[in-house]
Amino acid sequence: SIFYGKLKEIYSNTVFLDGDTLREVFGNDLGYSDTDRRKCAMRYSRLCDLLQKQGIHVVCCTISMFDSVRQWNRENIANYHEIYVEVSDETLQKRDQKGLYSRYQSGDETELAGFQVGIETPKNPDLVLWNDGEKTPEEQAEIMMQTWKINN
């Protein structure tokens, strides 16, 4: 969201889409099975494509689990940039921002991406950021700005 804020300062026609928020916007009508996750991902991709075609800059943050969806994005969304934010399982579990990992460890979470549910990690992202806490979110956002030569 910090990158979005920096981008919005330059391009007022910028929107931020978050996967969890989008699930709510679409009525939480899909579950967490592989089929539902794929449907959900394609909804987000088509929405990003629609907005981009209307001249809107889109920053969309999702778990992005599927190669086929990322390929669709590359083939259909103009100026698509894929950023892969890597983080260790240990760091994810330590942060546990949504309580998912503690629910997983207690057996209450049964479809946790990256644990019970496989993730197809990106093969050729445009940028890889390591989110281990060594760099601040502001520094990570600046790396993104520099990568695409966006001047603020």
Predicted regions and their residues:
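Glycine-rich phosphate-binding loop used to anchor ATP phosphates in small-molecule kinases
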Residues: 25, 33-81, 101-104, 111-114
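Short, structured coil segments at secondary-structure junctions
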Residues: 10, 76-78, 124
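The start of beta-strands in P-loop NTPase/AAA+ ATPase cores
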Residues: 13-15, 56, 81, 125
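Small-molecule kinase domains that catalyze NTP-dependent phosphoryl transfer to phosphate-bearing small molecules
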Residues: 94-152
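Conserved substrate/cofactor phosphate-moiety recognition/catalytic segment
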Residues: 1-46
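Conserved phosphate-donor/acceptor-positioning beta-strand/loop module used by diverse small-molecule
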Residues: 59-61, 76-95, 129
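Conserved nucleotide-binding/hydrolysis micro-motifs of P-loop NTPases
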Residues: 21-23, 64-67, 86-91, 134-135
